[in-house]
Regions:
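Conserved beta-strand -> loop -> alpha-helix junction used to position metal-binding or nucleic-acid-contacting
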Residues: 251-258, 263-299
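Acidic/histidine-rich catalytic cores and adjacent linkers
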Residues: 1-24, 47, 51, 55, ...
């Protein structure tokens, strides 16, 4: 049976009062944060002007107790409104104005150093925009995603300017001199990510180098996107470090990739090289059935974590004797690494823990992949390397000690 009830269009009044998405999503916490942010910024700028004039607002002379404090002669003349967008959202602030006397008897308008002329966004807001773009979101989607937070104040030109700033910082970081870096140790490792090349999803390698300063502080030295971990690829990375002034390191920690070890021998022959003990442990397990994994791990750890060089050597020989009889592939795999698996014993025992593995880079790789796991493919090889750097430079990924 056909219904005779006809749907009528909403009247003009009803249409105007119809609720819109997010209209009733008022958050008193967010509102309070913006109010406090506005108050803090205005107080910061007023304090800056007070310091320049050596007197607070509404006082003609210098503040009591500051009579001898040098200050610039001048006078305030009201304020002007400024719009500012931060990670807290958009706010309106009142920026104080002042005229300052100059040496030639004229006056000039005071300019705040805290809030630069024409500044419309905080650095945190720019970092948020850049992060969205670096993560593979195009300009249109960045604007759409951030329109609610920034009250629609993110235009195409804004995204483009922020992107150019990130690209400029990235280029400067890649070209910076390393001549004054007191690097004594290098940790080198690569990881595989998926990027779009010629409209196809392709696997590439990100080759990462961390430097360890004499005081133990770690610093990211290089990250390059390459087609793989070949000798030529790693040689490109090492040659670039040398070109930028990096001094010959005293110790190297690697994952065991043949291409890397060959490249190292070509540029830094004679420098002690430590094969990552964690990578070698994985290699051993890959050569044995699962039923032997627990026993292999116990014997391996007993050897690697022995307290003295003598104990390590004794347990190494015992490991090889036992596993040559029980499962020869295990003994052969350990012998393949040779003395490079135990190069850490050349260092003081207090440094053994940090010198045995490439864990410092492995943790960065894990955190980076966790950040991009929702994206099956990154936009390009260059963007992949830049995103790794940007996440670390912005503090979104932290390097452990």
């Amino acid at each position: 049976m056909t219904s005779n009830i006809m749907k009528t269009a909403p009247s003009q009044g009803e249409a105007q009062t119809a609720p819109q998405l997010f209209d009733d999503w008022f958050d008193p916490i967010e509102s309070a944060v913006r109010d406090r942010a506005r108050e803090f910024i205005e107080e910061l700028i007023r304090g800056e002007l007070d310091a320049v004039l050596a007197r607070p607002r509404y006082e003609r002379g210098k503040k009591v107790g500051h009579e001898g404090t040098p200050g610039i002669m001048g006078h305030r003349h009201g304020s002007r409104p400024r719009s500012l967008i931060g990670s807290f959202g958009p706010i309106e602030i009142a920026v104080p104005r002042a005229r300052l006397n100059t040496a030639d008897g004229k006056t000039t308008e005071w300019k705040s150093q805290s809030l630069r002329a024409y500044q419309r966004r905080t650095l945190a807001a720019d970092a948020l925009i850049a992060g969205c773009y670096l993560a593979g979101t195009n300009t249109r989607r960045v604007r759409r995603a951030l329109s609610t937070l920034f009250a629609g104040a993110v235009g195409k030109d804004t995204v483009s300017r922020v992107w150019r700033k990130v690209k400029s910082d990235w280029d400067a970081w890649n070209a910076r001199s390393l001549a004054k870096e007191p690097i004594v140790r290098l940790i080198l490792d690569g990881t595989v990510v998926r990027v779009r090349l010629d409209r196809k999803a392709t696997s590439i390698s990100l080759l990462v180098v961390i430097g360890v300063r004499a005081d133990g502080q770690k610093v990211l030295l290089a990250i390059k996107s390459m087609g793989g971990e070949s000798t030529a690829a790693w040689r490109t990375v090492l040659d670039d470090l040398i070109r930028r002034g990096l001094r010959r390191p005293e110790f190297l920690i690697v994952d065991g990739a043949p291409g890397l070890e060959t490249a190292i021998a070509a540029v830094w022959d004679g420098v002690p090289v430590q094969r990552c003990t964690v990578h070698k442990h994985r290699n051993l397990l890959a050569h044995a059935p699962e039923r032997l994994h627990e026993e292999i791990t116990a014997d391996y750890n007993d050897m690697i974590y022995a307290a003295t060089c003598e104990e390590i050597e004794t347990r190494r020989k015992a490991f090889i004797r036992k596993w040559r009889l029980k499962h020869r592939a295990i003994a052969d795999s350990l012998q393949e690494a040779g003395d490079r698996l135990f190069s850490f014993t050349r260092l003081p025992p207090s440094q053994w823990k940090s010198a045995r593995t490439t864990n410092a880079i492995e943790r960065l790789h894990e955190e980076f992949k966790r950040r991009i796991k929702t994206q099956t493919v990154l936009p390009s090889a260059d963007t992949a390397a830049m995103l790794f750097w940007a996440l670390l430079a912005s503090g979104q990924i932290n390097m452990r000690k």
